[in-house]
């Protein structure tokens, strides 16, 4: 899927506290996009985003998307979510997390890790190997890397190391 985004977009992540959504939000923020989001409770992922001055709303409310121009939803978000419904009424572009991840992946050469067991460990090992080289990849992992104290990091090279989820079919959105 081709996604055309301007840096002036305000991208709202519904379910931003999840490990995959928080990592994606962090990368897009690092790329220069205006990022905000909401979740039902605060956690360590949200704390890391707030340290980057990303606006986070507690709870899902229609008013949270008043300035948003794009919506990204987690697979955990139900179709009766008030932010989702308000975005549909405003005719905002709505993307699944996997679609937005596919967009990020389309901008780089990728090493992708997929499977039912060991994805986070394998992605972490590959990211660690890359860190010993002069290649500085973008990393989106399914867990917090001790070396980064985060699950994601925007790199400076044209490479990315991505953990993809098979449970929601998001791996089908990325062309390695």
Where are the regions that the model predicts?
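ATP-dependent carboxylate-amine ligase
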Residues: 1-45, 50-55, 67-71, 89-92
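Phosphate-binding loop of NTP-binding sites
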Residues: 4, 27-33, 50, 63-64, ...
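Generic enzyme active-site microenvironment
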Residues: 37, 57, 161-163
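Structural motif corresponding to alpha-helix initiation and N-cap regions
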Residues: 43, 58-62, 165
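Short acidic-hydrophobic, aromatic-tinged amphipathic segments that line or gate anion-handling sites
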Residues: 56-59, 95
């Amino acid at each position: 899927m081709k996604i055309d985004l301007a840096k002036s977009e305000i991208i709202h992540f519904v379910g931003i506290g999840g490990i995959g959504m928080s990592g994606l939000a962090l990368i897009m923020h690092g790329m220069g996009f205006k990022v905000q989001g909401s979740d039902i409770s605060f956690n360590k992922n949200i704390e890391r985003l707030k340290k980057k001055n990303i606006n986070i709303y507690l709870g899902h409310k229609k008013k949270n998307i008043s300035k948003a121009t794009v919506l990204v939803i987690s697979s955990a978000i139900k179709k009766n979510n008030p932010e989702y419904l308000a975005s549909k009424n405003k005719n905002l572009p709505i993307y699944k997390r996997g679609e937005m991840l596919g967009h990020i992946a389309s901008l780089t050469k990728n090493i992708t890790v997929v499977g039912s067991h060991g994805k986070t460990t394998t992605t972490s090992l590959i990211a660690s190997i890359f860190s010993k080289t002069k290649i500085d990849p973008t990393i989106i992992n399914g867990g917090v890397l001790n070396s980064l104290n985060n699950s994601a990091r925007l790199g400076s090279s044209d490479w990315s190391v991505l953990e993809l989820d098979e449970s929601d079919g998001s791996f089908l959105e990325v062309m390695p």
